[in-house]
Each structure stands twice: as structure tokens, then as C-alpha cells.
């Protein structure tokens, strides 16, 4: 081989060696730092890419040493591997970056998983078809020509003889001519067309993935990953064109490079560098960024970070749209983690900026509450972070929680307008409501200002019934089994709070977060502990159980006057808190939660949000905390129960009695959270044992 014929093979050999080396290093980082599983798709991707680079290096080196006869089959086999691992990356992008609807409806999550499964099966069968088809065509070409080639890179065919007088000539003596399909043997035309179709399908698949994942990519990685993916699409498109348009002679291939023209040099190096080497490097970058790992032990594994808590630092978090505002004035946003073991995870973050001492105390209290609670029916706490100035002043506090976009008040609003005249409804309409409604409109039933405006601030004016204001829409009421099951979940969460001596103090439907399966509620979780109070402070309990003489005297002084004189701050705080943390105070605080739970029962029965009102009928007079006192002059008539309940009072009697007992005018007659939980547990058990109603959401969905 002349010395100048070594130039392009040597360049390509170096490029493929670098690609393979980078793939090996990346796979080791994925395994030992990112904690990817050995049998994960990530490692399968790197294995295919390393295999391709190895095959390219071997065949190029072999061709540089000696003339390889029939080696074109081996030189083109890595082209098939390129399509295989490029398809795997597209599949992973869909798998890891689902549509936002997955977070809105669990059914959408199932759809995404279904798409991934379908995509996996399509990719498997496509690979089987591609490899089988190519091997078959290579075999036919080997039999006809004796030197099987494809993709417009044909070996030396001068030794081939033909017995047909009208056979298409396989050799051209012209250099730099643009060869079209008519200048080749039909088997080569078929090979080129087959591979072109494979590349075209790969291009379409990646274009679809780019369209579906653009927004999530932008949220998580900025514009970086989208630009990388766009360059990849351009490279695949260029390679597809180069398969069809070939300025080289049929004697040219990666093993037999025609050196008569610089045009052929440029074409050959462009085909492999732009069409395979650069895309391979881009795919490595995309794969490395995708954080889809199988191992569950993320705690303290590090990743790019030194510790698990570093995940929540402000520079590692991308904050997105505003979700709402907490009771303390903190802003709640949707956010994603940009790097670390939880990279790509979506969470809700409560942000308190320009913190005063009261703000810091409020949010730190909420963090302490979350840290003590572990229940599937309480919004889970993920972590927290602080931005501290050089002087030690705290400028910002962030509290990270699991992301649940729906609240019970919005779901009740949806059901209140998705029914029919018979009190039933359409699950399809309800599902479409959640999928296609961009923003929820405020319910007139969620604010007392609605009634204030209509009552003209006149206590003697006619009382307004909420249901009378909605016309031309019908409610989609819950079934008995659903109401019992949802209330049972909330009661478990509430009892978990009270068992830990924590009073929520702001229990209402817009602080109950719900996940959905199809169009039905699957799980109810209590959240938003902005103004909750914990009564198990060790210092306070010690003061109450075993006060010193000085502490006892200060307790007596506190009850005798509105203020207390203290000598030191360390003594004052537990005394003041202890003075307001008597068994009677704790019982009263818990009874507030039970009263609020009773209004949530009413919300389920009427599809209204009475628990969100500032005024809660006459029972509001029993709130001891000023936070809950009825400060408005608006009167709201205690609502009548809907007709569907009156038609079957025997069935609904246990739930109605629970509602009445929880909203009793005498707080001492209200049940405890444990009593509520046991009552609903028995109702739930009766439903299952009787089999009169299908209580399982999954069964309900499958029967529709």
C-alpha cells in the first residue's frame, strides 16, 4: 500500500481509538461513581459502542497491514452497531424524560411506561430484522460478486466475471464521478437502500424523542442537551445523504481507499467522522447526562457531589413555575435537581427569602415537623438548605418535598362540574379536565369573599346556598366506598400527627394533596405544616413534668398575668411555651384538627370546599386560637346534604354520624384521631368483606 494511502486509515484509527477510550472511561464512571447497575441499559449502550470502535480499529489496522479480500462485510458490520446503540439512547431519553402529565395523572405515567415497553419491543424486532436482512444481503453479494460490500463503498470487483451479456458493469475508470443507482449491481442498490431506510427510521425516532423531551431537557440541563441532540440529528441526516450520494468510484471503501482524487479523500473522512465518530461522541455525552440508574441506595453515594445533603444546594437546583404560596408567606415552586445522585428528580420546594427571625422560626419548625413524620399519607420531606451571608445572617431557606401537583380542593372542583343530571358522571370528561386545563380557575366556594360580596355585608340579608350558584353543570359524586377509603387515608395521616404530639392547625382540602389513577383519587396526603405546633419539645415536657421551684413560680405568674418577667432567655422560652402547653391546650389543639376533618367529610359529600372557609358555621366559636376565630360577619347557612345521600340514608349513615360527631358544638364530644381512624377502618373492612361495592381503584378503572 503506498504511503499516502495510510493517511485516512490512520486518522480514522486514531479517532475510533479515542471514541472507544472515552466510552470505557465513561462506563467505569457510570458503574463506580453514578452507581449504574452492571445489567442496565447504560452499560449495554457502552458495550455496543466499545464493540463498534474495537471492530473498526481491528479492520482498519488489518487493512493497513495487508490487502483484505472479502473484508468489506466486517468493515460494514459496525455500521449496524451504530444504529443499535443510537436507538438505545433515544429509548432512554423517553424512559427518563417523560411528559409532565406523568406527574399529573398516574395513568399518564403508565402510558409512558407502556410507550417505553412498546419502543423497546420495536427496537428489538427492528434490530433483528436489520441484522438478518443485512446478513442475507451480504451473503447474496458475496455469492454474486465474491467481495460483499454495501453503503456505496464497494471493493475491487475486477476479478468478477459475468456470464450475462446485458449485466450492468461494475467498474468505472473515471474518477470523481457522481455514481447513481444505475451504475451499480442491483444487490448494492438494495443494500444501500436498506441501510438508508434504517438511518431514516433512526432519524425519525430521534426527531420524535427530541420533540417530546425538549421542555424537560431545557428545564434540567438548560439548552445544552437540546443543542447536543440537534447536532446529532444533523449528523445522522448528513450520513443518510452520503449513503445515497457518493462521489467516489465503486473501487473505494474504508479498506480500499481510492487515492486518485482529494474529493474522495474528503468524502471518505466526512462519511466516517461526521456520520459515525462525532455522533458516537455526542451519544456518549447524552448517555452520560441521563441519570437513569437502577440502584436504590442513593444515600451518601456522592455522584458529582461530596455528600447527599449537597444535592439541595441552590447551585444544584433548577427552580421552575410557581405552584402556590404557603400559609407563612413562603413561595412554593416546582424544581428539578441538576446534578448528584438525585439528578433529574422533580420536587416541590418552599422558598422563604429575606427571612426575618419569625420567618426562620416558622420554616425551621415546619422542617422539624416533617423530619418526625413518616407516613404514606403525609407529604414526604426530602431535605432543606440555607443561604447564609458572611455575617452569619440567613437570607433564604428552602424546604424540599415530594412533588404532588393536585390538591383535594381542585379535584373536588373538577368533580363538581364533570357530572350528569343523575349525579353520576364521565371518567373520560374528568380525565380530560385534568389533562387539558392549563390553569385551574379559583372556585367560588374556596373563598369567603364570594359570600361577602353576595351578602352585601348584611347579617340580615338572605343566606346564600353554594350549590345554587352553579348552573348548567352537574356534580360527579363519589361512591360510598370511595369516600370511606379516602377519609380513612387522611385519618391515618392525622392520627400519625397526633401520635407524635403534633397539631396541624390548618387542615383543609387545599392542604390535602392527591395522586390520581386514571381520573380517580389514588392516595391522599396531608401537607403544608406552616402553622402546625409540636408539643413534644423535651425542654417543655421537662418543665411540665418536673418543674423546679423557680420554674413553678414562673408558671404561676404566667397564669396570673398576660406577661411574665424573666431573668434569662434560656429560662423564659420553655416557661412560656410550657405555660401554653397544658394537657387542656393540647387536647384543644387536637380537637381543632378533628373539627377540620369533619368539614373535609362534608367536602367529600357535597363536592364543596367548606373546610377552606374562614367561617365554619357556629362551630367556629370553639376555636381557642385567634388564628381560627371567626373574624368576619358573614353568615353561611349550614348546608343540607345532597339528595343522593337522602335517597340512601341507611348506607351513608355511618359517614353522616362521623361528620356530625367531628363537628359537634361541644369539643369534648368530638372523637380523637385514633377513634376516627378505627371507625373508618371498620367501615373499610365491612366494604371489603361484604363485596357489595368495588372499593379498589384499580378494579374500578378496569371495569370501565
UniProtKB/Swiss-Prot annotation:
Binding-site list for ATP: 323-331, 350
Domain Protein kinase as annotated: residue spans: 317-682
Glycosylated residues (UniProt): 147, 158, 251
InterPro entries according to UniProt: Kinase-like_dom_sf (IPR011009), Prot_kinase_dom (IPR000719), Ser-Thr/Tyr_kinase_cat_dom (IPR001245), Ser/Thr_kinase_AS (IPR008271), TF_kinase-domain_protein (IPR053083)
Membrane association type: Multi-pass membrane protein
Broadest EC class assigned to this enzyme: transferase
Entry GO terms, CC: membrane
Segments passing through the bilayer: 6-26, 43-63, 77-97, 122-142, 186-206, 225-245, 266-286
Family: Belongs to the protein kinase superfamily. Ser/Thr protein kinase family.
Protein name: Seven transmembrane domain-containing serine/threonine-protein kinase 2
The organism of origin for this protein: Dictyostelium discoideum (Social amoeba)
Lineage of source species: Eukaryota, Amoebozoa, Evosea, Eumycetozoa, Dictyostelia
Amino acid at each position: 500500500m503506498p504511503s499516502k494511502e495510510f493517511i485516512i486509515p490512520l486518522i480514522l484509527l486514531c479517532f475510533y481509538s479515542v471514541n472507544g477510550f472515552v466510552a470505557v472511561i465513561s462506563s467505569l464512571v457510570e458503574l463506580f461513581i453514578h452507581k449504574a447497575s452492571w445489567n442496565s441499559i447504560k452499560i449495554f449502550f457502552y458495550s455496543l459502542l466499545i464493540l463498534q470502535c474495537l471492530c473498526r480499529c481491528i479492520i482498519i489496522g488489518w487493512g493497513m497491514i495487508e490487502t483484505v479480500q472479502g473484508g468489506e462485510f466486517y468493515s460494514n458490520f459496525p455500521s449496524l452497531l451504530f444504529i443499535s446503540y443510537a436507538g438505545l439512547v433515544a429509548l432512554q431519553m423517553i424512559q427518563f424524560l417523560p411528559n409532565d402529565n406523568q406527574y399529573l395523572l398516574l395513568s399518564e405515567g403508565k402510558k409512558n411506561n407502556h410507550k417505553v415497553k412498546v419502543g423497546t419491543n420495536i427496537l428489538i424486532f427492528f434490530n433483528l430484522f436489520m441484522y438478518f436482512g443485512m446478513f442475507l444481503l451480504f451473503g447474496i453479494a458475496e455469492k454474486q460478486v465474491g467481495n460483499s460490500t454495501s453503503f456505496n463503498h464497494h471493493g475491487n470487483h475486477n476479478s468478477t466475471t459475468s456470464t450475462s451479456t446485458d449485466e450492468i458493469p461494475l467498474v468505472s475508470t473515471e474518477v470523481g464521478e457522481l455514481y447513481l443507482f444505475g451504475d451499480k449491481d442491483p444487490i448494492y442498490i438494495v443494500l444501500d437502500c436498506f441501510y438508508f431506510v434504517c438511518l431514516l427510521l433512526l432519524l425519525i425516532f430521534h426527531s420524535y424523542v427530541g420533540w417530546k423531551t425538549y421542555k424537560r431537557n431545557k428545564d434540567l440541563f438548560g439548552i445544552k442537551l437540546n443543542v447536543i441532540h440537534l447536532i446529532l440529528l444533523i449528523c445522522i441526516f448528513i450520513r443518510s445523504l452520503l449513503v445515497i450520494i457518493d462521489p467516489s468510484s465503486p473501487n473505494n471503501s474504508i479498506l480500499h481507499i481510492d487515492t486518485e482524487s482529494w474529493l474522495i479523500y474528503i468524502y471518505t473522512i466526512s462519511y466516517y467522522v461526521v456520520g459515525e465518530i462525532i455522533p458516537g461522541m455526542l451519544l456518549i455525552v447524552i448517555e452520560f447526562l441521563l441519570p437513569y440508574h437502577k440502584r436504590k441506595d442513593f444515600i451518601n453515594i456522592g455522584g458529582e457531589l461530596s455528600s447527599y445533603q449537597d444535592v439541595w444546594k441552590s447551585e444544584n437546583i433548577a427552580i421552575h413555575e410557581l405552584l402556590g404560596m404557603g400559609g407563612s408567606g413562603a413561595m412554593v415552586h416546582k424544581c428539578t435537581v441538576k446534578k448528584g445522585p438525585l439528578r433529574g428528580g422533580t420536587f416541590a420546594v418552599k422558598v422563604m427569602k429575606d427571612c426575618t427571625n419569625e420567618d426562620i422560626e416558622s420554616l425551621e419548625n415546619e422542617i422539624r415537623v416533617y423530619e418526625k413524620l413518616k407516613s404514606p399519607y403525609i407529604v414526604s420531606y426530602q431535605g432543606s438548605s440555607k443561604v447564609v451571608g458572611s455575617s452569619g445572617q440567613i437570607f433564604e431557606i428552602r424546604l424540599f418535598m415530594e412533588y404532588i401537583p393536585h390538591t383535594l380542593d381542585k379535584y373536588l372542583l373538577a368533580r363538581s362540574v364533570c357530572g350528569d343530571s343523575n349525579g353520576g358522571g364521565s371518567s373520560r370528561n374528568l380525565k380530560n379536565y385534568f389533562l387539558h386545563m392549563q390553569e385551574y380557575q379559583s372556585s367560588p366556594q374556596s373563598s369567603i369573599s364570594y359570600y361577602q360580596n353576595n351578602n352585601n355585608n348584611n347579617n340580615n340579608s338572605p343566606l346564600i346556598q353554594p350549590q345554587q350558584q352553579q348552573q348548567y353543570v352537574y356534580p360527579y359524586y363519589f361512591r360510598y366506598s370511595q369516600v370511606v377509603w379516602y377519609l380513612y387515608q387522611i385519618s391515618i395521616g392525622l392520627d400519625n400527627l397526633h401520635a407524635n404530639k403534633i397539631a396541624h392547625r390548618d387542615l383543609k382540602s387545599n392542604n390535602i394533596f392527591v395522586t390520581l389513577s386514571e381520573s380517580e383519587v389514588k392516595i391522599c396526603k396531608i401537607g403544608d405544616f406552616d402553622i402546625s405546633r409540636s408539643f413534644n419539645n423535651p425542654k417543655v415536657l421537662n418543665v411540665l413534668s418536673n418543674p423546679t421551684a423557680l420554674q413553678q413560680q414562673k408558671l404561676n405568674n404566667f397564669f396570673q398575668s398576660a406577661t411574665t418577667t424573666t431573668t434569662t432567655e434560656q429560662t423564659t422560652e420553655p416557661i412560656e411555651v410550657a405555660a401554653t402547653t397544658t394537657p387542656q391546650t393540647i387536647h384543644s389543639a387536637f380537637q381543632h384538627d378533628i373539627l377540620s376533618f369533619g368539614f373535609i367529610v362534608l367536602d367529600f359529600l357535597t363536592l364543596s370546599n367548606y373546610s377552606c372557609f374562614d367561617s365554619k358555621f357556629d362551630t367556629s366559636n370553639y376555636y381557642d386560637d385567634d388564628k381560627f376565630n371567626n373574624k368576619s360577619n358573614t353568615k353561611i347557612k349550614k348546608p343540607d346534604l345532597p339528595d343522593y345521600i337522602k335517597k340512601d340514608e341507611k348506607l351513608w349513615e355511618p359517614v353522616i354520624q362521623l361528620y356530625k360527631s367531628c363537628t359537634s358544638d361541644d369539643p369534648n364530644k368530638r372523637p380523637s384521631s385514633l377513634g376516627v381512624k378505627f371507625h373508618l377502618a371498620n367501615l373499610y373492612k365491612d366494604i371489603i368483606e361484604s363485596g357489595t361495592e368495588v372499593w379498589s381503584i384499580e378494579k374500578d378503572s378496569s371495569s370501565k
